[in-house]
Amino acid sequence: MKIIDICKYIISLGLIYILSINYGKDIINTIKLVNIDYIILIIFISLIQYILSAYRWKYISKYTNLNISFINSIKYYYISTFMNNILPGGIMGDIFRIYHHVDDKKEIFRIGRSFQSVVYERLSGQLMLLSFFILSLGLYFIIHQKYIAFSYLFLPLIAIFYFLKYIFNNNLRKYIKSKHYGNNFLTIFTGEVFWRHTVLSFFVMMSYIFIYIISAVSLGVNIDYFSFLVFTPIILFSMTLPVSIGGWGVREFAALLISFLLGLSASVSISVAIMYGILNLICSLPGLYFLLKLKSR
């Protein structure tokens, strides 16, 4: 195990330890209140989430000239998510997906069909996460009449958008086209193909947010649903940072910071994040089954 991976375990365990010292007793008391009926609902929503995510990967893969069956896309997506939940960095599962679909195992990180399919699929989800957060935060500012904050958010974003559009149309498009992966990238992230996988990413993102909100409801927490809709993407984004194990510790610390904006007690907000993490791991357990079945061949 590399030193950087050990550091990620230390970060996750260290942050959880710090939070448990300060809020441990209250967190345990809150989690004890969980309503199992909501857990069943979360598992059902998660199943739909995996099906949509796997189909998004299959759909994008078609435009990288990689043919993946729908059954295999579901199986490997479960495996990938399970591995991302327990291994450092949050990308080991994606590397596993690439490895098992790459033509030459020695060239796993070459920008080939398998590499492109996984990276572009992840990029589609991350773009939706970012877009959802920006739009929902803007709506939050308008509803709460925070017009100055709204202008500080959107005026720079508009300027950045047109600047990037200018760069893309004049230089970047030509550069991308000159690369062997360029046509695939432009096909996937422009036109009808882009909007189709973007719609899939929207519903996948909504499922993540619904699961987080239901995790809070399952603990009997009285929440402002719209505020949760706005700030949950921040917590989800924190989980994608490659500095921990499956987002553990970082997610809970982000929830602590968000608690001040949501008007929740710190222990309740952290409890919701922990419950979400536990449920996220439970929902990915079919990946362990598929992985063991794969290893037994």
Feature map (PLM): residue ranges:
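Membrane-embedded alpha-helical segments of transport systems
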Residues: 79, 83-87, 112-134, 271-286
